[in-house]
């Protein structure tokens, strides 16, 4: 391509590293830099690591800023702030707060003539679309959602932000009795939080 989409990454945790890999494999994109509140020693791909306080110096050098911070505290502040000057994409996944996040981002982008896509990814995102498709072809059916067994990045991030916690991981595990009930056709009226076990492993400071 003659002109590639110029990408910036804000946040350099697990998600930021993953986005860096994906952008570098996309023929129509080029990574301009990685922005962080920390002073990073460098990046895996060799692109500049830039302190977030200098982000406005890149306003005309980046077409899309991909926000890779945590939903618990980062994106609610960084999203509206960065959307004043950049087109942004985020993976905000605190489901009950998505309408609030949408309203905040919508107001900022309209006021500043920018654009933002929120809650992009697997869940919410593609997983949400799959549920809609399922409900559309089986209108008399009932959808159940199970997560895991696996690490929840969002919940793990929330654990690590608790004072006194040095490190932590949270595993989301479907409860077998609910899996069996759904698979057998009996179903259940239990809410999603009852159908899962959230197992936390914490290292204190």
Model-found features: residue ranges?
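Extreme N-terminal starter segment of soluble prokaryotic enzymes
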Residues: 2-7
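Active-site-lining helix/loop region of Rossmann-like oxidoreductase modules
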Residues: 10, 18, 133-205
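Hydrophobic/small residue at the entry helix of a nucleotide-binding pocket
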Residues: 15
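NAD(P)-binding Rossmann-fold cofactor-contacting core
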Residues: 25-45
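Active-site regions of enzymes building and remodeling cell-envelope glycoconjugates
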Residues: 44-55, 86
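Rossmann-fold NAD(P) dinucleotide-binding segment
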Residues: 55-64, 72-91
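Rossmann-fold NAD(P)-binding glycine/threonine-rich loop
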Residues: 92-116
